[in-house]
Amino acid sequence: MTPLLIASDVNIFYGEKQAVCGVNLNVQRGTVNALIGPSGCGKTTFLRAINRMHDLTPGARVTGRITLDGEDIYGPRVDPVTMRRRVGMVFQKPNPFPTMSVFDNVVSGLRLAGIRDRDHLMEVAERSLRGAALWDEVKDRLKTPATGLSGGQQQRLCIARALAVEPEILLMDEPTSALDPASTARIEDLMTDLKKVTTIIIVTHNMHQAARVSDTTSFFLNGELVEHGPTEQLFTSPRDERTEAYVTGRFG
């Protein structure tokens, strides 16, 4: 099966400093893929390259090639805004648009794309909120401010907002690090359901979380991808001694 995402010799620089070195990684469609490693190892830097967020950082530069369904996402004819609709992003801390209602948050991306039909927007909002396991909790509060939701609900709202534009890949950068255990469990369960409709790449410092939710895991260290493979294999019989040292808690 041809991978949905292929990263080939990806290098990322901030000015003269190289933050990611020669990463090669394939991601299959309909899977959850965890990126693990100590702080500053390059995993989030690599994640942000997948939807061209480094375009917004002065002095940042990405070399190599990343293809999404065969298309080079850094190709000269690729519109970064269009690409970011194909590659959704959920950040570490919930970030609903504070001046918008729950409903307006979910459909904001569609409105930016010029979609105005109210019935269609409502249909997408309900589908996305159901997909984020939030509909039953907010269906009577769609016109209320999103900031009135709990932290866990706000994060699921951000997931619904990302799902509304039907991304091919959903990137999640430490999506549960600011949440309580119950909210974390809800989002972990949600990831298992979401891979039926999209592909997920999650950065996490929580190795137990990676083991619970992911199909494959990639271990980053000092800007390099040290090892990538099926999650169970990487945690129980890693090929590289550096991976073993990290997953057994000898460093990191």
From Swiss-Prot:
One of its GO terms (cellular component) is plasma membrane. It catalyses: phosphate(out) + ATP + H2O = ADP + 2 phosphate(in) + H(+). Gene3D superfamilies: P-loop containing nucleotide triphosphate hydrolases (3.40.50.300). Residues 5-247 form the ABC transporter domain. Keywords: ATP-binding, Cell membrane, Membrane, Nucleotide-binding, Phosphate transport, Translocase, Transport. It is a peripheral membrane protein. SUPFAM superfamilies: P-loop containing nucleoside triphosphate hydrolases. The keyword ATP-binding applies. It is an enzyme of class 7 (translocase). ATP binds at residues 37-44. It is found in: Cell membrane. One of its GO terms (molecular function) is ATPase-coupled phosphate ion transmembrane transporter activity. Part of the ABC transporter complex PstSACB involved in phosphate import. Responsible for energy coupling to the transport system. Belongs to the ABC transporter superfamily. Phosphate importer (TC 3.A.1.7) family. This is Phosphate import ATP-binding protein PstB. It comes from Deinococcus geothermalis (strain DSM 11300 / CIP 105573 / AG-3a).
